Amino acid sequence: MIRNKAFVVRLYPNAAQTELINRTLGSARFVYNHFLARRIAAYKESGKGLTYGQTSSELTLLKQAEETSWLSEVDKFALQNSLKNLETAYKNFFRTVKQSGKKVGFPRFRKKRTGESYRTQFTNNNIQIGEGRLKLPKLGWVKTKGQQDIQGKILNVTVRRIHEGHYEASVLCEVEIPYLPAAPKFAAGVDVGIKDFAIVTDGVRFKHEQNPKYYRSTLKRLRKAQQTLSRRKKGSARYGKAKTKLARIHKRIVNKRQDFLHKLTTSLVREYEIIGTEHLKPDNMRKNRRLALSISDAGWGEFIRQLEYKAAWYGRLVSKVSPYFPSSQLCHDCGFKNPEVKNLAVRTWTCPNCGETHDRDENAALNIRREALVAAGISDTLNAHGGYVRPASAGNGLRSENHATLVV
């Protein structure tokens, strides 16, 4: 199966290349802001905005003008893609205006900041991979680390400034992704949480994945770095050093979290054919002020994103259970619904109908697994002990409608 895959490599540009990267970032930002202002002004004057084709023609004239001739000194693809990004921002805004759901705001002017990027296209072999280096338009050969992992047909490269002195390139390639062999286990239910990041069950056994809490464990260092930055004079050399140190700590947290999530999602995809998860809405869940930091630290949204694209790559199936499905409240053995379990403080409970004692998270994982199988058209009549149970009756039992969404 042909898929697009991004390979991230660290760049080590020399002084001249660093200056050119920064100039390219600034030029791309200038083009975006200039034509955003032009489109706004044109709409106010005539009631009609400018099209992408019109702005592209104006960009050519802008590069030829004496006062902005410096635009022709940087990568032309970076400027053209900046126009495309502006066009995409407009389309996303107008699309969500007409549709219900989460809204996208009107395009905003871009500020000079640390985490900027530009995208360049592959054409006529202008991007090449060498031993310990990467050739990019205008920059030439740049020293790299990690380029040996790049494979497939190169489509484009995004050059990103993480913080001062730290640059990365994301190389998007078209690669052949082979299907994995049949998984050793059939289906899993995954219940995510805060104390344990995930409880995974195959219907009989449970595996608790501990939550590493990378942000909370680094909070002391972060606060110290933030205090140091607040005491520095903005624009000074010491301010720049303090800002870079703070950015490095944040980057390390992100890298550790990504590594943990990649290892967990890869192991799930390799081990199970069907994976049932909750259809989480982290943005809504973060409205709870007491849990917001812990939810953000866990990275549930990124976990689901990785799980879905890896399942699609390798021929597995992800079944997302509705957020309204009461996975924690239902007794997995008899289907009785206990509303008292809505209280998050209840970690274990005994079913008043059948007398079975449940661990809150393990019971939820079992119910999610069962619902995932129902969505896949497979009935599950095994309880946690491997014994057969009859389908739940109406009333307090499991409802008959499907609560899951399949992602293939």
Curated annotation (Swiss-Prot):
Q: Which organism is it from?
A: Deinococcus radiodurans (strain ATCC 13939 / DSM 20539 / JCM 16871 / CCUG 27074 / LMG 4051 / NBRC 15346 / NCIMB 9279 / VKM B-1422 / R1)
Tell me what this protein is called.
Answer: RNA-guided DNA endonuclease TnpB
What's the biotech application? Answer: Has been shown to cleave dsDNA in a targeted manner in human (HEK293T) cells, suggesting it could be used for genome editing.
Instruction: Respond yes or no to whether keyword Cell membrane is given for this record.
Output: no
Consequences of knocking out this gene: When tested in an R1 strain with only a single IS200 element (DR_1651 and DR_1652), not required for transposition of this IS element. Single tnpA or double tnpA-tnpB deletion leads to loss of transposition.
Keywords on record = DNA recombination, DNA-binding, Endonuclease, Hydrolase, Metal-binding, Nuclease, RNA-binding, Stress response, Transposition, Zinc
Give the protein's function: An RNA-guided dsDNA endonuclease. When guided by an RNA derived from the right-end element of its insertion sequence element (IS), cleaves DNA downstream of the 5'-TTGAT-3' transposon-associated motif (TAM). Cleaves supercoiled and linear DNA in a staggered manner 15-21 bases from the TAM yielding 5'-overhangs. Binds reRNA, an approximately 150 nucleotide base sRNA derived from the 3' end of its own gene, the right end (RE) of the insertion sequence (IS) and sequence downstream of the IS.
In its miscellaneous comment, the UniProt entry states: Belongs to the IS200/IS605 insertion sequence (IS) element family, formerly called IS8301. This element is subject to strain polymorphism; in the ATCC 13939 / R1 strain genome sequenced by White there are 7 complete and 1 incomplete IS200/IS605 elements. Another R1 strain has only 1 copy of this element. Another group found 2 copies of this element in untreated R1 strains. This class of protein is thought to probably be the ancestor of Cas9 and Cas12 CRISPR endonucleases.
Question: What quaternary arrangement does the UniProt entry report?
Answer: Monomer.
Give the source lineage, highest ranks first.
Bacteria, Thermotogati, Deinococcota, Deinococci, Deinococcales
GO biological process terms held by the UniProt record: DNA recombination; transposition
